[in-house]
């Protein structure tokens, strides 16, 4: 073949150990001419103290740490995900490769050949071996590894058999270039690396061959050049102008170890090339030359294979990706550098393999269109405590590129904030209740004073004027009317139906601050809007019917309208037989989008729930002011299957309390009480999942297995509280001490204990 000297590879002066000369593609517009090496760098500053030695085991070992092309691009997480570039063919159009080097053993494609002569698979000049080393040097525990260390190299030697023209890197036959590019296309290359450029233009045949390659879906990585100019070399720009719309070109610029643009690197420019320009390490890249020597080399010649290796990792890990998608991923996940957005220096930014491997765009469960979050798919409620849903090895999700990932759904579930029952119990100090009666009607309003101590009324609830609203806030109210001697009706706003039921029955228990009545809670903080109660006596037994409508209080949702709704309807029988009192009740709780206050995304279950509670209480007057009490609640919750993933589920819950109290313990009018209580807890249950656990890229179908999503905790909160009350000095003195084990039904939580002293003046 005729040597015309139009192509110039990136480095001819970097074939000795720790070489300092620059290497890269060129600029200009003449037949294949060598690109001059960059000027030598200024003397380096004094070196910093050596870093600590890298870990000795695993993928993050000394060999990886020495592979600065990979480390600078943050490749470790891709390796940890199993990506190696295996079975991905990268064509290196260069000066050949030394096939005897162990760095490439078993991974040189049989179609590799000398396109410029008949020398066999050899590399007399070293540039091709060094470029190939950056891409795919073996991970063998010696020196360094390539970015895609299991990729296959299709080596296409276009080097001049006579060597480079003296004093230049003019080493290629122009007529060999289109032949080599066509061979890459016809032999199944996924990526073509071209670490060369030109000064005065390439023949039309070369550009036509490149266009045929990208039209076949092959990624083409080209060096920007080493002239330090404001634009990439003309070979790269002409290719982008001819076929850039295919989205398969990347122009590789160089950064140094400090992630700054290399002084010798041609920049992105302000033209069409900037959108295709990506930087990667191009100074001091560790690799091997054609003799097997360990060398450090400079030039955009080595930025290009770093990016080619990244593309090979993506292609091997995600076989569904097209070449254009791989290029788009590399460009859109680059770290922004220089001016915000695409700029004239760094173009799209700095290569970041870790980001390219992260899910991009909207994520959905494989086999469905159900959206799934990577971080927040719900919040378990208090009764679920430390429940650990069994999702096995995780669920398969697809990102916006239909790439399959394993997501541990359990790790995307949060917990409701831990309750602070003592703080909540004593916060009632700034409340007072005002009541008025007229005949058979009684009206009561609970007032919370403002910070200045003056009473204040919430205008949106009571529809008062602005001045009245400034002074007081009514937080709850009730109107009770006795319809007949045996029948009473009550209405409430911002007051629970449980409280209405107690008031209708004439019983009130507020001795305990922490171990509160477990029958009053359904597993979440209710925000009652309205409530109604009707009580009717039938001989010695009374029937109470109540209804409540409200919103589930959820952390982070400040506006009440955003909170999920619930309805709670109850039927209770209570009576007295001698010294004993009893009650039996049933309640139906309907939640619009929550499950006992737990919030789940649509991929799990956001269709709400239905819960039936059965309650029983009994108290016995033991005489001498001594009274015993026991209460038990059992709940059954059903959850509809609202997605293709979730089938119907059920929960079984329970709560209980045992009290012992004595009036007149130490003085007339005092009372000492002790309670043991378990808040509502999921005893068993969850829902069944038809979970995607595998994915076949060939058929684009997931493999499903049945998994159980457990919502029962391992922890069990038990509250112990002692309370003492005494009328004193025109007021009331209350002393409380408590212990909570496994707070929030979380076994790992430390026990919570405390005490409170309160003195309340009678108003």
Regions found by a protein language model. Name each.
Residues 94, 102, 239-312, 316:
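Extracellular S/T/G-rich loop segment that most often corresponds to the catalytic His/Ser-adjacent loop
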Residues 24-35, 84-85, 158-246, 290-304:
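Substrate-binding/access-modulating region of protease and related hydrolase catalytic domains
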Residues 660, 671, 750-763:
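Outer-membrane beta-barrel "beta-signal"
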Residues 508-524, 544, 559-563, 570, ...:
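Outer membrane beta-barrel transmembrane domains
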Residues 51-56, 76-90, 95-111, 118-173, ...:
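Subtilisin-like serine protease catalytic core
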Residues 24-87, 102-103:
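Protease zymogen maturation seam
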Residues 59-70, 74, 182, 189-193, ...:
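C-terminal subdomain of the subtilisin-like protease fold in secreted/lumenal serine endopeptidases
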Residues 134-135, 156-159, 190, 281-348:
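Hydrolase catalytic cores
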């Amino acid at each position: 073949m005729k040597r015309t000297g139009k192509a110039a590879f990136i480095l001819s002066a970097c074939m000795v150990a720790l070489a300092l000369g620059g290497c890269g593609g060129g600029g200009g517009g003449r037949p294949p001419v060598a690109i001059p090496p960059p000027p030598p760098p200024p003397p380096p500053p004094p070196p910093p103290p050596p870093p600590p030695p890298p870990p000795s085991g695993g993928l993050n070992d000394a060999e990886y740490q020495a592979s600065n092309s990979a480390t600078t691009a943050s490749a470790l997480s891709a390796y940890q995900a199993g990506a190696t570039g295996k079975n991905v063919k990268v064509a290196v159009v260069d000066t050949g490769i030394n096939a005897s080097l162990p760095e490439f053993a078993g991974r040189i494609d049989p179609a590799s050949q000398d396109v410029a002569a008949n020398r066999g698979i050899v590399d007399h000049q070293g540039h091709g071996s060094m470029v190939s080393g950056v891409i795919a040097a073996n991970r063998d525990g010696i020196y360094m590894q390539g970015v895609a260390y299991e990729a296959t190299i299709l080596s296409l030697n276009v080097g001049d058999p006579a060597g480079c023209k003296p004093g230049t890197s003019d080493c290629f036959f122009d007529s060999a270039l289109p032949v080599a590019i066509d061979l890459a296309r016809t032999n199944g290359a996924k990526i073509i690396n071209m670490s060369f450029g030109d000064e005065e233009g390439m023949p039309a045949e070369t550009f036509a061959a490149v266009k045929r390659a990208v039209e076949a879906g092959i990624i083409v990585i080209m060096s920007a050049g080493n002239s330090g100019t404001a634009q990439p070399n003309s070979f790269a720009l002409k290719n982008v102008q001819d076929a850039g719309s295919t989205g398969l070109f990347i122009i590789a610029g160089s950064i140094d170890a400090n992630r700054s643009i290399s002084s010798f690197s041609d920049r992105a420019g302000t033209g069409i090339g900037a959108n295709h320009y990506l930087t990667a390490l191009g100074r001091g890249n560790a690799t091997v030359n054609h003799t097997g020597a360990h060398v450090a080399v400079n030039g955009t010649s080595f930025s290009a294979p770093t990016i080619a290796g990244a593309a090979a990792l993506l292609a091997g890990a995600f076989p569904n990706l097209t070449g254009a998608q791989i290029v788009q991923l590399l460009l859109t996940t680059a770290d922004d550098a220089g001016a915000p957005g695409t700029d004239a220096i760094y173009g799209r930014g700095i290569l970041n393999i870790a980001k390219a491997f992260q899910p991009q765009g909207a994520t959905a469960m494989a086999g469905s269109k159900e959206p799934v979050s990577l971080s927040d798919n719900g919040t378990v409620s208090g009764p679920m405590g430390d429940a650990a849903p069994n999702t096995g090895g995780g669920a398969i999700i697809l990102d916006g590129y239909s790439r399959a990932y394993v997501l541990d759904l359990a790790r995307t579930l949060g917990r409701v904030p831990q309750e602070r029952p003592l703080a909540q119990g004593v916060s009632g100090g700034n409340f007072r209740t005002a009541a008025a009666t007229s005949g058979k009607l009684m009206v009561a309003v609970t007032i919370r004073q403002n910070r200045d101590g003056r009473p204040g009324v919430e205008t949106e609830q009571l529809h008062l004027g602005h001045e009245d609203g400034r002074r007081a806030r009514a937080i709850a109210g009730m109107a009770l009317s006795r319809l007949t001697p045996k029948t009473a009706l009550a209405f409430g706003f911002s007051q629970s139906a449980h409280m209405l039921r107690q008031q209708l029955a004439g019983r009130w228990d507020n001795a305990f601050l922490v171990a509160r009545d477990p029958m009053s809670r359904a597993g979440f903080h209710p925000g009652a809007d309205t409530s109604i109660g009707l009580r009717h006596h039938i001989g010695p037994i009374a029937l109470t019917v109540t209804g409540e409508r409200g919103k589930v209080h959820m952390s982070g949702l400040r506006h009440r309208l955003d909170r999920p709704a619930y309805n709670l309807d109850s039927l209770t029988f209570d009576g007295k037989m001698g010294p004993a009192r009893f009650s039996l009740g049933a309640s139906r709780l309907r939640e619009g989008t929550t499950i006992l206050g737990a919030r789940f995304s649509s991929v799990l279950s956001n269709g709400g729930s239905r819960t039936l509670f059965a309650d029983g209480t009994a108290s016995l007057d033991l005489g001498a002011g001594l009274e015993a009490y026991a209460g038990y609640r059992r709940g059954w919750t059903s959850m509809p299957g609202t997605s293709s993933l979730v089938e119907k589920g059920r929960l079984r819950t329970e709560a209980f309390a045992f009290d012992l109290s004595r009036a007149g313990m130490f003085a007339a009018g005092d009372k000492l009480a002790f309670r043991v209580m378990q808040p509502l807890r999921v005893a068993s249950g969850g829902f069944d999942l038809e979970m995607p656990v595998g994915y076949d890229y060939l058929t684009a179908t997931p493999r499903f297995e049945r998994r159980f999503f457990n919502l029962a905790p391992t922890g069990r909160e038990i509250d112990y509280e002692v309370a003492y009350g005494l009328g004193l000095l025109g007021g009331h003195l209350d002393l409380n001490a408590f212990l909570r084990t496994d707070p929030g039904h979380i076994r790992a939580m430390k026990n919570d204990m405390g005490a409170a002293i309160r003195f309340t003046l009678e108003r």
